[in-house]
Amino acid sequence: MASPSICLLAALLALVSWQAIASDPSPLQDFCVADMHSPVLVNGFACLDPKYVNADHFFKAAMLDTPRKTNKVGSNVTLINVMQIPGLNTLGISIARIDYAPLGENPPHTHPRATEILTVLEGTLYVGFVTSNPNNTLFSKVLNKGDVFVFPEGLIHFQFNPNPHQPAVAIAALSSQNPGAITIANAVFGSKPPISDIVLAKAFQVEKGTIDWLQAQFWENNHY
């Protein structure tokens, strides 16, 4: 039988290995600017030859302070990830500006590859996230200018501007160069091809006609 010290060492190695594969890979050099034209397929992007790298690979022009045009649900997400700044490749971070119209929201969604930390720049936001099964506990808070809130990786979360007269603005930092986003309503009712209405009617315990109506709607897909 293995000694307790060997079992402990094996457990620690398993924990370290799990942490290593649960986030973006760490850089092994000063930088690895994404080569968007490389034919090499890797998890992320191949590195551009350093002799072709310049400051513009780490730069994005200012996100203007003027309010952005919002979509049907009253929000506009401006994401800066590795696709906009190639120098973010292997660095495990991205950022987004989110503009909210009065009574606008960033609808329930999840980031499959990132934790998010949100800071309110202007206005007020009601925010929250829901834990996984079986409890599905809602953690929510009303945030004002300067307040910060964290959304754990992979959990469904949302932001809503409760003010009917004033817009709101927030900045979100995400722990991945490419966090991904799954907008829940869009994924369930707007998938291509659509999920069977029989499946959804049973899942939501409603009539098929209700599902057909929901699938016929246009569902916003906030990209970040």
Swiss-Prot record:
<protein>
    <recommendedName>
        <fullName>Germin-like protein 8-10</fullName>
    </recommendedName>
</protein>
<feature type="glycosylation site" description="N-linked (GlcNAc...) asparagine">
    <location>
        <position position="135"/>
    </location>
</feature>
<feature type="binding site">
    <location>
        <position position="116"/>
    </location>
    <ligand>
        <name>Mn(2+)</name>
    </ligand>
</feature>
<keyword id="KW-0732">Signal</keyword>
<feature type="binding site">
    <location>
        <position position="109"/>
    </location>
    <ligand>
        <name>Mn(2+)</name>
    </ligand>
</feature>
<feature type="glycosylation site" description="N-linked (GlcNAc...) asparagine">
    <location>
        <position position="76"/>
    </location>
</feature>
<comment type="function">
    <text>Plays a role in broad-spectrum disease resistance. Probably has no oxalate oxidase activity even if the active site is conserved.</text>
</comment>
<dbReference type="InterPro" id="IPR006045">
    <property type="entry name" value="Cupin_1"/>
</dbReference>
<keyword id="KW-0052">Apoplast</keyword>
<keyword id="KW-1015">Disulfide bond</keyword>
<keyword id="KW-0464">Manganese</keyword>
<keyword id="KW-0964">Secreted</keyword>
<dbReference type="InterPro" id="IPR001929">
    <property type="entry name" value="Germin"/>
</dbReference>
<feature type="signal peptide">
    <location>
        <begin position="1"/>
        <end position="22"/>
    </location>
</feature>
<keyword id="KW-0479">Metal-binding</keyword>
<dbReference type="GO" id="GO:0030145">
    <property type="term" value="F:manganese ion binding"/>
</dbReference>
<dbReference type="Pfam" id="PF00190">
    <property type="entry name" value="Cupin_1"/>
</dbReference>
<dbReference type="InterPro" id="IPR014710">
    <property type="entry name" value="RmlC-like_jellyroll"/>
</dbReference>
<keyword id="KW-0325">Glycoprotein</keyword>
<dbReference type="GO" id="GO:0048046">
    <property type="term" value="C:apoplast"/>
</dbReference>
<dbReference type="InterPro" id="IPR019780">
    <property type="entry name" value="Germin_Mn-BS"/>
</dbReference>
<feature type="disulfide bond">
    <location>
        <begin position="32"/>
        <end position="47"/>
    </location>
</feature>
<comment type="subunit">
    <text>Oligomer (believed to be a pentamer but probably hexamer).</text>
</comment>
<dbReference type="InterPro" id="IPR011051">
    <property type="entry name" value="RmlC_Cupin_sf"/>
</dbReference>
<feature type="binding site">
    <location>
        <position position="157"/>
    </location>
    <ligand>
        <name>Mn(2+)</name>
    </ligand>
</feature>
<feature type="binding site">
    <location>
        <position position="111"/>
    </location>
    <ligand>
        <name>Mn(2+)</name>
    </ligand>
</feature>
<feature type="domain" description="Cupin type-1">
    <location>
        <begin position="62"/>
        <end position="212"/>
    </location>
</feature>
<comment type="similarity">
    <text>Belongs to the germin family.</text>
</comment>
